[in-house]
Amino acid sequence: MSTTIPLKHTARTTTGVVPPTEKKKGSKLFALKTDFLKNDEDSIQKDILDHVEYTLARTKYNFDSFSAYQGSAYSVRDRLIERWNETQQYYTERDPKRVYYLSMEFLMGRSLQNAIYNMNLKDEYHNALLELGFEMEDLYEEEKDAALGNGGLGRLAACFMDSLATLKYPAWGYGLRYNYGMFEQGIYDGYQTEVPDYWLVAGNPWEIERLDVQYTVRFYGQVTEKKSSDGSKFEWDHGELVQAIAYDTPVPGYHTTNTNNIRLWSSKPHKEFDLDAFNGGNYLSAVEAKQRSENITSVLYPNDNTYSGKELRLKQQYFFVAATLCDVIRRFKKSHQNWQDFPNKVAIQLNDTHPTIGVVELFRKLIDEEGLQWEEAWDIVTKTFAYTNHTILPEALEMWPVSLIEDLLPRHMQLIYGINHRFLIQVTQKWPGDIGKMRGLSIIQEGEEKRVRMAHLAIVGSHCVNGVAAMHSELVKHKVFPDFFCLWPEKFQNKTNGVTPRRWIEQANPGLSAIFTKWLGTDKWTTNLELVKGIKEHMDNPELIAEWKYVKQGNKQRLAEFILKHCGIHVNPNALFDVHIKRIHEYKRQLLNILSVIYRYLSIKKMSPKDRAQVVPRVVIFAGKAAPGYVMAKRHIKLINSVAEVINRDKEVDQYLKVVFIANYNVSIAQVIVPASDINQQISTAGTEASGTSNMKFTMNGSLIIGTLDGANVEIAEEVGQENMFIFGLRTSEVEAAREKMTNKEVNIDPRLQEVFLNIELGTFGPPDVFRPILDSLIFSDFYLSIQDFPLYLDSQASVDELWKDQSAWVKKSIINSASTYFFSSDRAMNEYAEQIWDIKPCEVETTLNRRY
């Protein structure tokens, strides 16, 4: 069941194009609105002050930094909305094929700086605010990061949306408007603590609540079959109803009118308040349904260790796709009557398996609500959807109990059985009598508890499946889904990830941005990163080398001040900044890093003063969150902080080594850390990281990688040259044999690592029993092969130290890295998706209003 609830005064036309009669009725309105808002300093100042007075209801006597930020944000939003309206109207009139990017996460970071830069209003806002007594950079700090994501998946989606708007592709993102982020991380006694991240505490000036866009989403209920001369028809009714309310966030393209949209859904009760229950004295029951409905979009990734947690996660996923598909279909129906046109006008990208139930939901709507036949409906579905796989880790490939889906989404489970039945007929035609193939490929995993394999459903229901790095895509084809690849080789592609250079160079590193513009003689590199290759022509120029070092030093000084303010630790900005920032997970091997730090500490302690004089000073920086239920990862955080406490208070090594764990890592913090990094750690066990995007951000900013040949590191090595990185460790092809050796106790622990273990066991870094499970996991299992890679890792770290002593050579390698990153721009990635998966074309908005672009 789906209903649009338009307000009377905002009723929409069938096509979205205003008819001449309406224009005549509102001729005064059209006469008044013939231009965009003015962007001179006086106009901007007036708009800011008007919002402070009329939107915030504050006076000029109560005009502090936060109200200045809010007033500025609302004034920028006004300008965004103008462009947004122009863009959507233009798309409606031209009717291009659109892509809808479905993602459970959008890790947007802060929006004020991004919007001002993209709309080319940096100087105007800087000067306007300066006259009002505010530095624009200070106001950026007033904004709280939108807590709509957790890690790389959400940040990738944000970069992609930026590129789609910049490249003028007609695209919308869809997701959920979480009231709380995953959690706000603190550190207490070295342990991670978690408190709710209520990021909306002061409101969100960037979103537009769309009370005229609501859809009803159903859960539970019953399915009844009604037979007629035309055949059987299935109706899903009763159950629990929840309202989906739309919230829009405009996404500006860079120096273009084109402004796309991210539409997020918030859950509200279908029936706001049970008055009968209240009047009957049942006060808790009166609000119970309201609370249950609102829980759906309360928290990003609720803990799914319990049945109720699993149910809530699946509710989130279905609520998300059900509302989204209602919206997509409504938009399609405004100007199209023939369902065969749907795949020619709509492309839907599934960002990982979370939105996969949308495959079945579209199928259900076509069959049950639109009356299409099975084959016709399924053909439309498979031509519409495409699926991006982001992992090869088995535990990350989602599966849901059949019993849960039968209870929560009974009609969908019926359809999944039917889809699987027809799919397995294809399998038997390819491999007659091969039960093993049927069992391995089936959407439903048999066993004591039957489960639906969401990745299998996504592959079966999509016309294209892509990995996110060359190595990852090969593993997807030959290791994760080899039988699917054998069945449908034409479905599988690689689309290496990318990041936006606008945020990660121009905004995060204005000094480097200025260098590029000066030495290239143009600022066009912001939208054509291939131009940056030209900087290599000047890499031997002493002036460029001096500027490069100056900018890096300034970024390191800024990070040192940040660390002092937020961590209370003094660090030397002249030291080598060694950075490891990402989600805390065993496969990402923060453990390998901290074990090497312990060895470095023990080595320095044993050195003579003469030997210490040769030591390269280091600041080792960690940041990242562990999932609340991931006990081992949280132990790793405890070990890092315990080691940091011992090292940082040891005056004997004070000038040679510091260790910092920066809590509550987010996009804004990354924008401070990344430009200041000298080396960055990309040390996952070979064959475990799908791609990674932090490696791309660091490389763009001239930070050298120490890492394994895993994920996108492989392609970075191809672009920058392996000689300009510090590569170590087992290769993917060697991992299985290495694990076999570990299982058979054929691995000797390096004496240096034995010394590290001994010091942990002796309590050098805290009570040994706290860290005993970590040591046991290494000695008796070591699935991620830290023991075998440890000596190779130390050798690579020694190479880092040696190169650092030759600063001229170091800077040249830094320049080569930064100048070789065109392939890792999200612009390149989006062009490939558009041409090879979605079949969409740019649609540059030609506005009737005067504009500066």
Curated annotation (Swiss-Prot):
- Enzyme kind, highest EC tier: transferase
Q: Which reaction does it catalyse?
A: [(1->4)-alpha-D-glucosyl](n) + phosphate = [(1->4)-alpha-D-glucosyl](n-1) + alpha-D-glucose 1-phosphate
Q: Nucleotide-binding among the record's keywords?
A: yes
Query: What residues correspond to the site Involved in the association of subunits?
Result: 159
One Pfam match, given by its short name, reads: Phosphorylase
Question: From the record, what ranges are coiled-coil?
Answer: none
- Per the entry, which co-factors are needed? pyridoxal 5'-phosphate
What biological processes does GO assign it?
A: glycogen catabolic process; response to cAMP
Gene3D superfamilies with a match to the protein in the record:
Glycogen Phosphorylase B
Q: Which residues bind AMP?
A: 91
Q: Which residues carry this modification: Phosphoserine?
A: 27, 75
Query: What are the N6-(pyridoxal phosphate)lysine sites (modified residues) in this protein?
Result: 697
- InterPro entries recorded: Glycg_phsphrylas, Glyco_trans_35, Pyridoxal_P_attach_site
Tell me the function of this protein: May provide energy to overcome environmental stresses.
Instruction: State the protein's name.
Output: Glycogen phosphorylase 1
